[in-house]
Amino acid sequence: MKRCYITTPIYYASGKPHIGHAFTTILADVIKRYKQQNGYEAYFLTGTDEHGNKIESKAKSLGLDPQTFVDQNVAYFQQMWKQLDINFDHFIRTTDLSHKAQVQHAFQLLYDKGLIYQSNWEGAYCVECEQNYFTYDKQTMLCEIGHQLTLVQEPSLFIAFKDSKDWIGEMIATNKLNITPESRAAELKNNFLDGGLNDLALTRQNVTWGIPVPFDNKQTIYVWFDALFNYITNLGFAHNDPKFNKWWNNNDEEHEVIHLISREITRFHCIYWPIFLHQLGFKLPTQFLSHGWIVDGNGHKMSKSLGNVISPEELLAQFGVDGTRYCLLKEMRLDKDNRCSMAIFKDIYNADLANSFGNHASRTFGMIKKYLGGQLDFIEVQDPQVKQLMDQANQAMVQFDTAWNNFQFYKGINGLLQLVFQASKLIDQLKPWELVKQTDYTLLKQLLFACVRCTQVCFVLLAPILVHTSTQIFDLFNFSAQARSKTHLADPQQLQKISLAPVIQPLFKRLD
């Protein structure tokens, strides 16, 4: 059976979830649902990264112990994912005892292979990013995304990359890691590999909130090493859990492992993580999806200090669950930084959901109710203009899958928007209200059947995003189980008997 293991990065539990967390997690949820629609068995992992100096410092400033602090923040994440209808299979926490034991096991394995050695770390450290810097601006003392750097000099255990430099360089130069968009691979090569890949310090001495080194409890394992291994600790890799071979370490050609990440953490996931896996003899993920930054309407990166952050709560209050999921997925592209504002999302909501998809479904429902008493049986379409619309529905399905399989979600959606536009245009041309007066019920039924077909195609394909509205539409038109299924979508004969619900509830109310 085809399988797909989808992961988000585990989010740093130093505060509440923000719009970037919401986008990545919605994207993972939509991919999971889409894969399941297409016959895959899918497993979706998300969670929280809970160790490190930043957590410890923030907890202390609030008069809390670190565990209490992260417990509070984890609850915010779990509640938000519930509100957004995120259907994950496992929520991992790096404070889980099983995770900690398995991270120590991985560390010990690498040490036993002679890949970890004692030396001294000297350079700059960003507490906010939990990241070391060999090179940095000595004037500003800011990291690459603007956080304050601290000079550090301390003994540390390092992992040797000398036998992996050429390997990872070739993997990235030829994009054998399958990084999307491909421009991210070029960024990694230019920014991190061309100048030489330094060995990585894997431990800190003065951080107590973390996982101790298994053979030296005076040192704590680097938070990024700890965090990256969540993708296989949740599968019980160190315990011979069958889940590890099922979802990760197998040779099935139809098996996919997709890591969703944001641009600023691509280096850790696409350089260090593949090296660790390679050194341990484990398989690599099959796909890395690295989306750009989320910026405000003026192109500025969102940050609390600039006061331009949009919270998921604001989006939910304005657009509801389906509206929030749709606006984020429609607007966000993987190949660029994405401008976001409440005004931009409002325009998308009104144009796409209220005026296009919602209006088409409501209009189709209303015409069948008014002109045909709410009943419509399957009919062979003969009229050339209506047949052209039916053909366009079939083409939209193919184009949608092509786009989504290439993670170009907006392209697939735009094809469906074009479909309902053409349906609206045909309604205005054929004037069903005139067909009734002329008692031309043959053409009327063909037109309305094609409109139902367009409704079916749009809302079956959009069901991974519009989880509530799609079901509402299916119920309004009394679609059979087969008519609601992607498996049978290519066959319009699944629409054998349309019997409308008594009344239609508002779908997407236009926002002023």
UniProtKB/Swiss-Prot annotation:
Short sequence motif 'KMSKS' region: positions: 301-305
SUPFAM superfamilies cross-referenced by the UniProt entry: Anticodon-binding domain of a subclass of class I aminoacyl-tRNA synthetases, Nucleotidylyl transferase
Location of the protein in the cell: Cytoplasm
Binding-site residues, ATP: K304
Cofactor note: Binds 1 zinc ion per subunit.
Main location: cytoplasm
InterPro entries for the chain: Met-tRNA_synth, Met-tRNA_synth_2, Methionyl/Leucyl_tRNA_Synth, MetRS_core, Rossmann-like_a/b/a_fold, tRNAsynth_Ia_anticodon-bd
Listed Pfam families: tRNA-synt_1g (PF09334)
Catalytic activities: tRNA(Met) + L-methionine + ATP = L-methionyl-tRNA(Met) + AMP + diphosphate
Top EC class for this record: ligase
EC number(s) on file: 6.1.1.10
Keyword field: Aminoacyl-tRNA synthetase, ATP-binding, Cytoplasm, Ligase, Metal-binding, Nucleotide-binding, Protein biosynthesis, Zinc
Cofactor(s) it depends on: Zn(2+)
UniProt keyword annotation of Signal present: no
Job of this protein: Is required not only for elongation of protein synthesis but also for the initiation of all mRNA translation through initiator tRNA(fMet) aminoacylation.
Record-stated family: Belongs to the class-I aminoacyl-tRNA synthetase family. MetG type 2A subfamily.
Oligomer status and interactors: Monomer.
Protein name, per record: Methionine--tRNA ligase
Gene giving rise to this polypeptide: metG
